[in-house]
Amino acid sequence: MFLRLIDDNGIVLNSILWLLVMIFFFVLAMTFIKLIQLCFTCHYFFSRTLYQPVYKIFLAYQDYMQIAPVPAEVLNV
């Protein structure tokens, strides 16, 4: 009975603890969502700045290194 103004049977403390738990899970969910958004942003950035130019260079190299097929006259020896 020390420092008790109302006999609430712990409902205020229980409500405060549940509120803290809900805030913790809310912050955790927001962090997870922001992490996923960061992954999509990084993927978009690298796709535009790294993957597409490297792929274009690879296609140019592949076109440059293309070997012409052997003519049919050479095979009829």
From Swiss-Prot:
Q: Name one GO biological process term.
A: viral budding from Golgi membrane
Annotated InterPro entries: E_protein_aCoV, E_protein_CoV
Record topology, Virion surface segments: 1-15
Keywords from the UniProt entry:
Apoptosis, Host Golgi apparatus, Host membrane, Membrane, Transmembrane, Transmembrane helix
The membrane topology term of the UniProt record is:
Single-pass type III membrane protein
* Cellular component per GO, a single term: host cell Golgi membrane
**Which residues lie toward the Intravirion compartment?**
37-77
Compartmental location: Host Golgi apparatus membrane
Transmembrane stretches in the record are 16-36
Look up keyword Metal-binding and say if it applies. Answer: no
Signal peptide: which range, if any?
A: none
Could you tell me what this protein does? Answer: Plays a central role in virus morphogenesis and assembly. Acts as a viroporin and self-assembles in host membranes forming pentameric protein-lipid pores that allow ion transport. Also plays a role in the induction of apoptosis.
Member of which family?
A: Belongs to the alphacoronaviruses E protein family.
Q: How does it assemble?
A: Homopentamer. Interacts with membrane protein M in the budding compartment of the host cell, which is located between endoplasmic reticulum and the Golgi complex. Interacts with Nucleoprotein.
- Name the record gives this protein: Envelope small membrane protein
| Origin species | Human coronavirus NL63
